[in-house]
Amino acid sequence: MSKQNNFRRYNPLIDEWVIVAVNRINRPWQGAKTEKSTTISTSSNTEQSILNPLAPGGTRSSGIANENYVSTYVFDNDFPSFTEFEECAGKDENDDLFKQHEVKGVCKVICYHPNSQLTLATMDVKEVRVVIDIWNQQYLELGPKYEWVQIFENRGAVVGCSNMHPHGQLWASNYLPTLPMKKHESQKKHFEKHGKVMLMDYLEQETLKKERIIMRNEHWTWLVPYWAFWPYETMLLPNRHVERFTDLGEVEKQSLSEILRSLLIKYDNVFECSFPYMMGWSGAPTGSFLTENCSFWQLHLSFFPPLLRSATVPKFLAGYEVFAEKQRDLSPEIAAKTLSEIDEEHYSKKLQ
């Protein structure tokens, strides 16, 4: 059995380390498998509304019926983690060992398309652009009121998605959550030490190295981070300095719709399935931070896909990762090479 050197890599964005143990990818697997991820298959909009509570005209478990929407549709989450009228379960506490404070916010669901069989990968570019414009609109509306606006998507049952209709979510909160706070502090420290925006500095160096770059266009670069934890984890970065999503120009948003669709097609083609992932935008915080200098921030979109060996074998968080330190089996460079070489035509078209 050949031995390969394992090593650790540092993630400066969240001040954490990850072990890269490439020899573990070859270990025999007799563990759990998941079902291959697919989209909902229905034959008509009428059937969709009956079977799928997120479809146009569908009735959700709250008893509220959706509009008969024909494009991207946004509604308040029926089971929100935050509300604007949150009542704290007891008073705030500031003891060193017992801290509690009130949280307020809003949670929304963003249905990308009325057709339950489509995803961002299989929608056309014009339809993806509509989703991007909705994201921008929501940031503009909620940013002045809330400290953090998190737009994200859980795609696939393996990452906890409760409905396979193409949709994402938005949670806006009156405080800066833990991971965004880490990113805020790390990027600020990097700027104070080096006089450079961390992720712009990083992108410049990755562009020279090339080995983890997957795809570029005039305005965006898609790459596997040097410190990636998830098997096919990637990051999408603007090629210029952009603090927040709302700072993107019209041409950049159009360019985003094109590269976003292309990269999601590549993801689906890895194992010829509806590739599951967790996707989320990060940019400079909002609310009271809008009056502060956040020029050290760089907007970025992260993808955390769990699949590792096949369409049915994901990465599982195991004991060492939970109790000690994160670890990955596939090197970021191999993941980048795999994604770079994959076709940009969706696999489903070859099956027709």
UniProtKB/Swiss-Prot annotation:
Positions of region (Disordered): 33-57
Any single GO CC term annotated in Swiss-Prot or TrEMBL for this entry: cytoplasm
PROSITE patterns attached to this UniProt entry: GAL_P_UDP_TRANSF_I (PS00117)
Domain of life: Eukaryota
Active site: 167 (tele-ump-histidine intermediate)
Enzymatic class: transferase
EC number: 2.7.7.12
InterPro entries to which the protein is assigned, alphabetical: GalP_UDPtransf1, GalP_UDPtransf1_His-AS, GalP_Utransf_C, GalP_Utransf_N, HIT-like_sf
Catalysed transformations (reactions): alpha-D-galactose 1-phosphate + UDP-alpha-D-glucose = alpha-D-glucose 1-phosphate + UDP-alpha-D-galactose
Zinc found in the keyword field: yes
Pathway in which the depicted protein is active: Carbohydrate metabolism; galactose metabolism
Family: Belongs to the galactose-1-phosphate uridylyltransferase type 1 family.
NCBIfam families (UniProt xref): galT_1
Protein name: Probable galactose-1-phosphate uridylyltransferase
Organism encoding this protein: Caenorhabditis elegans
Phylogenetic lineage: Eukaryota, Metazoa, Ecdysozoa, Nematoda, Chromadorea
